[in-house]
Structures are given as C-alpha cells and as structure tokens.
C-alpha cells in the first residue's frame, strides 16, 4: 500500500467513496400527485393501455362492466368495484389474453329526470315538454359521465374510454328493443292489471331492485273487528252442541272476525279476509259477551294486548271457515272469508288477513282465485280516490291512516292501535315509502322461463359460492317483473293502443320497424314523430286509429340488456361474458335482470362466472353517510384534503392497494388509520424496489448472467423463492384472491428480501470490488427480482410498477412493464432440499438475532459486527444444515457468519468463558461474545489480522486488498 503521505491520499479521503453505494433516480418518495399522471401520460402516448390487451394473440377474455349510474360523484364503492375489475384485466393482459374492457353507464331513469327538474325554475318546468326534458337529461348525463370517467382514469383504470357503452346511445336502444321484442314474441311479456310497488313521491311503478328497506320504519298497525253476518250451518250446529246454554241467535249476533293490518288506508279496498286452511281457529268470548274469531295460537297474546279475558267456546280448522260473511267496515256490503295460503302465519297479527286485491300480491292472487274485484282506491299521487268513499282526497302517506282509524274507532270496530317496527319498502331515490297499487302495467312473465333461469344459475360459477344460493332463492320466489314505468326519461315501450277500445298493436313487424328507426334516429322520435311516421308502411292507412304508448322501460331492463347491446354487438368481446363483477346487491339487480333477459331470449346465462363484493364501510364498520361525517372520499385519498397533515395525498396506488388488501367478499372498512397502515406497506414495497434498483446501477445482464448452478446457495435459494412467490401470486390472481397477493407481497418484501436476503447482501454489494463474483452474482439475482417484482405488482400497483420499470438502469426489450408478459420461470429453479436447509438456518438466525438484540437492549454492544457467536447444537436437523452449508456453500457468500452479519461464528462442543449473553433454547445454546481483533474502518468487521490504512485507519485483509487493487 502506498504511504499515507502520498499526495494521492488527501486527509479528507473517506472510505465511503470506495464503497459501491446505492445509485438510482427512483425516488424514496412516490410524489404520486405528480408522478402518477406522468406515468398515465406515458401510457397514453405509447398506447400502453387497453389496446395492449386488444392486440394480444391469446383467447378473448371479457369482463363485462356493470354500468354505474350517470349521476353524482364517485365514492368508495365505485373504487372497490372498478379497481377489482382493473386488477383482473391487467393480469389477464399480462397473461396474453385479448382483453378489451368496455366501460358503461346507465343513463336513463328517475334520478336524472329529477335532477333536471330541480335545476329549472317553476315557470320553466311548467313549459317543459317531453322532448326538451329528454334533451336536458341527455346533456346532464353526458356531463356526469365525463366527470366520472376522469375519476376512473385517475385511478389508473384502463378501458375503451373513447367508445364506452351508454344506455342512451342509439345502437344500445335499438338492441334493447330487440331484446324486448324477442321476449314479447316468445310469449314472455304481457300487459295486465296487477298490484305493483308504486312510489307516490315519484309517481311511477318500481321494481324490487329499486327499493330499499330502512332499519327504523314504524307503521300504524290496527286490530279491527268485523261483524259476522252469516255463519255456515256446520259451524252453528257444532257451536250449540258444545255450548247448549246460549240462546239460538246469540252466536251470530255477537260474533266478530278479528283482523290486523299495518296499512289502515287499505281498509276501504277490503274485498275479503283470508284464513290458512291448516291453522286452528277459535271463537273466544270476552266479559262483554263479544265473540272473536282468531287463530288459537295467538289467543293468549291477543288477550293480553286487548286486556280482555278470552274464553274459548269453539275450535275449528281454517278450512271450515270458508264463505262466512261479514259486514264491510266502511261500505254497505257483505264480504266473505276465503282460503289463503302459507303467507298466513301465527307469527303476528290474528291469523286472519285483511285482503285488498288491488293493494297486495298475495291478496291479488287470492282475489283471482275467488274472482274478487281488483279495486284500487289510490291514484298515482297516493291520494285516495272515489272508490274509497268518504276518505277521497286524503293521502296514504299523510292523513289517510288517521282518518280511517278515527272512523273505525267511532264505529266501535277498532280494538287496538300500536306502532309496529318492520321492514318496509322505500323508493331508493326519493327515500320515501312506497305502496302496493294495482295499475295496468307491462310485465315479464318469469313463470314462463323460471325453470330455465334456475338451470342457468346452476351452470354459472358464483364467487363466493354463497351467491348462487342467494340468487337462486330470489329467482325461485320472485313474481312477474314489472318492466313499465310512467316517466319520460327512458326507452319507450314500442306499443300502439287503439284509440277506441283495449286493443294493442305490437308484433314482429312493428318491433323490427321501431328497432330500425331507433338505430338510425334514436328513441326521441317516439315523442317527436306522429304515429303514421312510426308505423310500417302497410299500417299507415290506419294510423288515425292508433295512439302511442307513454310508458318507458324499467332501467333494470335497460342495463339487463347490455349483453345484447354490447357483448353480442362488439366483435372484440364475447357472449356469454367470462365474468360479471359487481356488489352483492346486484343479485337482485343487474345480475338477475341480465340473467332473466338472456335466458328468455337465448336460453342461456349471459355470464360464465359472477364475482360479488361487499360494501365500503368506515373503520368502525358503519355505513358511510354525510350525517355521520364518516364519508371517505377516494379523490381525497389520492390528492389529499385541504389540510395535508390530516388528509395526506396517498395517490391512486394506495387506493388500489387497499382494494387488494381486503376480503372483498364481505363489507370492507376504510379510514385514516387503515390508510396509514397501507401507506406503510406501500412504502416498504417501494423502498425494497429502490434498494434493488440502486444496487444494480452498474450491472449489465448482457455481460454478467449466470446459470443457477453457478450461483452461491443463498442466491439459488433466492431465485427459487422468487419462483415460489410468482406461483403463489399467480394463483392468487387466477382465483381472484387478491388479499393473498397482498399478504404474499408483504411477506416477500419484508421477510424474504429486506430482513434476510438484502440484509445479508449489504456486505457483498457495498464492500466487494465492483466486478467481483460475489457482487455480480448478487446483482444478477437482484435484477431478476426487481424486474419480476415490477410485473407481479403491476395489476395492483400499476403506477409504481411502471415507475420501477422506467428506472431499470440497463436497456430492456420492453418499453413498459405491461409489455413484458407474465413471468415464466423454470420450475427447476425450485429446490426442496435447499429450501429445507435454508429454512432451518433462518430459524437459527432468528434465535441468534434475538440474543444479539438482547445485548443491544442492554447497551453492551452497538452493531452486530461487534460480536461473535458460538453455537452448541441440540437439534440435529440444524446441525446437519450447518454442515451442508459448509460443505456446499460458496466461501465468499455462504459463510453463516456473513448471514448473521457478525464477525465470527463457530459450532462448538462447549461454550467459551466471558459471554455477553447465553440463550438456551430448543435448538441449542447460543453464546454471544465480544468480537476478537480490531474493527476494519471500511467494512466494520472485526479481524485478528489488521493492516494500516489511510491516516492511521485500520483495514482487514480483504479491504486492504481492494483498496490496493482499485484505488492505488
């Protein structure tokens, strides 16, 4: 070595300058607010987006987008849904599938119509015709679509944003008319009078999927007595046989039917009362000599409710009560008892059901059986009409209940009134109660194809499997689907009605003609053109006889036709789609409407697999609401809030990481604490990548590449572990188990890389000479790890993955990480014997590190290199692994001393004296001693043999050699 007086060595010379330190432009901080949009611009500029998947040569993979509603700001539910879809699409793209994701929007319906009306002055509303309303609704929908689209793009979602599908587009409307037409021609669509869910606040019929059931709904329930006017001879005879002391007319004169209802306003619509033929009923008398007919099992409960002592006089089966007559409570007519079904139970009420066929499905079905009138006593606003008699003009949601209750009390028919908490349907848009109301509507007859729909459900893979049972039970039990709506903003039902009479004009010729017109001109012509211009030529002469229908289609029929309007129409997609993916509420919504239309038209399901996710809740498991102040805004997660200390900008990748971290099959929490934890995980992955990139800055794979058997054992293990992790992550993606990806990624980056391989590698990387095998072999492994880590995380952490790829310091064939394709390693890289030995040695390393940490905590030592370790084995397995390592390991890399990052390690038969600490455990005795020798000022190892360095510094033999070789 040259003397320290040599002018080449200046006093300020630092050994730091002789180390191979980390060098990379990949920053420690993500700076996501700026960097992520830059990456997205890079993708756009280089067509690194959905077109990548479109240009792949593999099989078509179609994830068909369930259309979000084109109204309102994006929320965490959107984020969960769209990111899940994007993870799958990006993974499939990397796997070589032809992926063409077409995002869609649901554009018709009441919310948009109401928004348009709310934005107008009252004078403007009065003068607004249907065409202008539809024009304004179209404009409003496009504004909302553009706003939501920008949000989706910012999340890193890839899709055909230039040509999404919109239910308001001409091509879509035309295809939907085709679905309607085929269902009609197959005999599955009919028009009829039937009770439907009716929203007085919206003035339209609603489908089941448009309802919600608030937790805190109370109805005014009443118990009512109805005077019996006629009993059967059989019951009269039996009564007097069992009660001979009563006078001849006493029984009939004093007997009342007892009913219970939660809708007092329907009392004027009463046409019968229904009993269950299998239930036992009693005639029970009170102290005032009034006799009540009610279910036997409820007699005691009702006795307590009425505060009356009831004594049973006669017990009969429900089937014997048929045709008993009673006085209608509000009208001058007699009604009768009819036989109902299993919907009549003894769980509540009296076991006898007030029956108003115009205001309930069960009532309607019983009414058809007995040819009862389907009387509707309510108009479209919820006001009682002329059929209600003296109650006309009162409103079912306001004063009608009280008026009728007062009337019943005045007539001495009211037995009890009480508030009753139960599930009650509300209009999901206006948040106000709905009612059942019989109106002329268009229906899809599910009975006509129910068995085919149930078979189709069996043919689909449901993820999670519970989804199958859920939708199956819904389809088994559902009634006919009301598909007509009394609103302007929707697709018209293409039917013509005879001006004089009930005849309708709807056939294949009409349907095909309207479908063609809508395809060319759009659905607005239904309101703009005269009947003669809408009819086919051979009907024009009789156009004066017909008028256009005014009903529009249920929005669930709109979105439920998307398989026909999108998957069947676009050559880059396929039908049935490979996957539908939406929230669990869509079992009764889009999944079901799509299934029903597809089965009705083509006798097959529109999807092969259906995956459902839960809802996003706050950290305490509560539903998010503005009133609770617990709404988490995805935009604030990405860009930060007004106070960045409280609401920092995490970027889209942390949002995406959250999606991958949760068990999406159930409701999932999100909040500030969870985001902080995810940010820490994100940072660990990023720092791991940075360390890998920074240490291959001078590596060239074209010069320094190795076969696996040329590598040290530690490197062979690392590559084998990379293959295992790739297989595990691949399986997680394949099975849509993204939380497993999250767990595997964390463990790989923290446990396998940071805490083990990279921790050990520091000496190899920093201290070795630049081109030394022990360094280049490590760089070779690190290059493999960082390249493939970027690919493995890219479906989830797409921006970070691209950032990593752009900072790989040597040239790569692929411009983008997404052009790389999915890793395809040789399985020969996996070595079970190697894994077993390394696992044993890692366990020993953990125990030794605990002992060293004990010394550090006692402030006996600082760095682990200040120690040496003696190990007295108890465990033969561990001892054999140490022997194996010594026999087969590379002397420059695989010394267990270097794996421990201590200055010396020995397997001993007895322990030395002067221990810092001794740990006696299952695998043996671990003795920590002060390291012998002196500290090398360059590598910090303690060695017995020390050489003089620069300016009185000390160097070990290895470092002295490197300094002499490379710096003299």
Curated annotation (Swiss-Prot):
Residues that bind L-isoleucyl-5'-AMP: 582
Textual note on the cofactor: Binds 1 zinc ion per subunit.
Catalytic activity line of the entry: tRNA(Ile) + L-isoleucine + ATP = L-isoleucyl-tRNA(Ile) + AMP + diphosphate
Motif ('HIGH' region): 68-78
Pfam name, any one: zf-FPG_IleRS
MF terms (GO), sorted A to Z: aminoacyl-tRNA deacylase activity; ATP binding; isoleucine-tRNA ligase activity; tRNA binding; zinc ion binding
Cofactors: Zn(2+)
UniProt-listed InterPro entries: aa-tRNA-synth_I_CS, aa-tRNA-synth_Ia, Anticodon_Ile_BEm, Ile-tRNA-ligase, Ile-tRNA-ligase_type1, Ile-tRNA_ligase, M/V/L/I-tRNA-synth_anticd-bd, Rossmann-like_a/b/a_fold
Positions with a binding annotation for ATP: 626
Family: Belongs to the class-I aminoacyl-tRNA synthetase family. IleS type 1 subfamily.
Swiss-Prot/TrEMBL domain comment: IleRS has two distinct active sites: one for aminoacylation and one for editing. The misactivated valine is translocated from the active site to the editing site, which sterically excludes the correctly activated isoleucine. The single editing site contains two valyl binding pockets, one specific for each substrate (Val-AMP or Val-tRNA(Ile)).
PANTHER family for the chain: ISOLEUCINE--TRNA LIGASE, MITOCHONDRIAL, SOLEUCYL-TRNA SYNTHETASE
Assembly notes: Monomer.
Protein name, per record: Isoleucine--tRNA ligase
Biological classification of the source: Bacteria, Bacillati, Cyanobacteriota, Cyanophyceae, Synechococcales
Gene name linked to the record: ileS
